[in-house]
């Protein structure tokens, strides 16, 4: 998956993991049980023909992906296109609502965008094998934090670049949990994708594109990292070792 990488600068038990449950896009809150709500992995698979249409692509649950060379690192395991797009203006802010996230799962929050065909994202997929990979992906934001927080309905925001061309976009958003990343595999990737119809904007076609899989390597310092290792300073103080967020530079207009 090649992505426009705009890195947002903010940066145990399966029950302790999380996923994006809902969002506020274009001023609309995509709330529970509305037809355009985000995919619900513990409800949608059991609804048969009554399953609501979604703006986000399917995910298997709240567990992680650990293989950076797997197709699952694109939008999560078994992901398929969603039928709807959320309208949003270029330059506007999108707020994503995560489910419960444990404080112990510290790591970067990263957002990418990929331009879909002019007909939309609803029938477009990055592919089911490593080649071709998802094209035209750029990182739009990233920040280092402890994740959304340890509270219910935690929020993470990103801004749609104001200069990109209007059209349909697939947004890949993830948290990389580093609590077990001292050896590979160990880092836990929690990707999810939703679909936008971007209005306004400019005429910029970002060129700093990457692919998923392909953007991350197991040897990247941001993938294999000991979050608990400390470095001694000249003042006999111990500080956490520096962390480098994996992937390309953040795109700016």
Swiss-Prot record:
<dbReference type="GO" id="GO:0046872">
    <property type="term" value="F:metal ion binding"/>
</dbReference>
<keyword id="KW-0503">Monooxygenase</keyword>
<dbReference type="InterPro" id="IPR005103">
    <property type="entry name" value="AA9_LPMO"/>
</dbReference>
<dbReference type="Pfam" id="PF03443">
    <property type="entry name" value="AA9"/>
</dbReference>
<feature type="disulfide bond">
    <location>
        <begin position="163"/>
        <end position="253"/>
    </location>
</feature>
<feature type="glycosylation site" description="N-linked (GlcNAc...) asparagine">
    <location>
        <position position="22"/>
    </location>
</feature>
<keyword id="KW-0119">Carbohydrate metabolism</keyword>
<dbReference type="InterPro" id="IPR049892">
    <property type="entry name" value="AA9"/>
</dbReference>
<keyword id="KW-0964">Secreted</keyword>
<keyword id="KW-0479">Metal-binding</keyword>
<protein>
    <recommendedName>
        <fullName>AA9 family lytic polysaccharide monooxygenase F</fullName>
        <ecNumber>1.14.99.56</ecNumber>
    </recommendedName>
</protein>
<keyword id="KW-1015">Disulfide bond</keyword>
<feature type="binding site">
    <location>
        <position position="179"/>
    </location>
    <ligand>
        <name>O2</name>
    </ligand>
</feature>
<feature type="glycosylation site" description="N-linked (GlcNAc...) asparagine">
    <location>
        <position position="143"/>
    </location>
</feature>
<dbReference type="GO" id="GO:0004497">
    <property type="term" value="F:monooxygenase activity"/>
</dbReference>
<feature type="binding site">
    <location>
        <position position="105"/>
    </location>
    <ligand>
        <name>Cu(2+)</name>
    </ligand>
</feature>
<feature type="binding site">
    <location>
        <position position="17"/>
    </location>
    <ligand>
        <name>Cu(2+)</name>
    </ligand>
</feature>
<comment type="function">
    <text>Lytic polysaccharide monooxygenase (LPMO) that depolymerizes crystalline and amorphous polysaccharides via the oxidation of scissile alpha- or beta-(1-4)-glycosidic bonds, yielding C1 or C4 oxidation products. Catalysis by LPMOs requires the reduction of the active-site copper from Cu(II) to Cu(I) by a reducing agent and H(2)O(2) or O(2) as a cosubstrate.</text>
</comment>
<feature type="binding site">
    <location>
        <position position="190"/>
    </location>
    <ligand>
        <name>Cu(2+)</name>
    </ligand>
</feature>
<feature type="disulfide bond">
    <location>
        <begin position="75"/>
        <end position="193"/>
    </location>
</feature>
<keyword id="KW-0624">Polysaccharide degradation</keyword>
<feature type="binding site">
    <location>
        <position position="188"/>
    </location>
    <ligand>
        <name>O2</name>
    </ligand>
</feature>
<keyword id="KW-0732">Signal</keyword>
<keyword id="KW-0325">Glycoprotein</keyword>
<feature type="signal peptide">
    <location>
        <begin position="1"/>
        <end position="16"/>
    </location>
</feature>
<dbReference type="GO" id="GO:0030245">
    <property type="term" value="P:cellulose catabolic process"/>
</dbReference>
<keyword id="KW-0560">Oxidoreductase</keyword>
<keyword id="KW-0186">Copper</keyword>
<dbReference type="GO" id="GO:0005576">
    <property type="term" value="C:extracellular region"/>
</dbReference>
<comment type="similarity">
    <text>Belongs to the polysaccharide monooxygenase AA9 family.</text>
</comment>
<keyword id="KW-0136">Cellulose degradation</keyword>
């Amino acid at each position: 998956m090649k992505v426009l990488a705009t890195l947002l600068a903010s940066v145990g038990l399966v029950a302790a993991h999380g996923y994006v449950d809902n969002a506020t896009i274009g001023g609309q809150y995509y709330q529970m049980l509305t037809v355009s709500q985000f995919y619900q992995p513990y409800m949608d698979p059991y609804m048969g023909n009554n399953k609501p249409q979604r703006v986000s692509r399917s995910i298997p649950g709240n567990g992680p992906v650990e293989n950076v060379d797997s197709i699952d690192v694109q939008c999560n395991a078994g992901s398929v296109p969603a039928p709807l797009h959320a309208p949003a203006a270029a330059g506007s802010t999108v707020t994503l609502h995560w489910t419960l996230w444990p404080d112990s799962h510290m790591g970067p929050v990263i957002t990418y965008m990929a331009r879909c065909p002019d007909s939309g994202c609803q029938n477009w997929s990055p592919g089911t094998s490593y080649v071709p990979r998802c094209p035209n992906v750029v990182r739009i934001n990233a920040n280092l934090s402890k994740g959304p927080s340890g509270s219910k309905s935690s929020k993470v925001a990103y801004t749609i670049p104001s200069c990109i061309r209007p059209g349909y976009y697939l947004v890949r958003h993830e948290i990389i949990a580093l609590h077990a990343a001292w050896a590979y595999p160990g880092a836990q990737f929690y990707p999810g994708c939703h679909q936008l119809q971007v209005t306004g904007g400019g005429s910029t076609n970002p060129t700093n594109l990457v692919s998923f899989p392909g953007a991350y390597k197991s040897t990247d310092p941001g993938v294999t990292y000991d979050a608990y290792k400390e470095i001694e300073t000249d003042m006999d103080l111990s500080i956490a070792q520096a962390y480098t967020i994996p992937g390309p530079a953040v795109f700016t207009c």
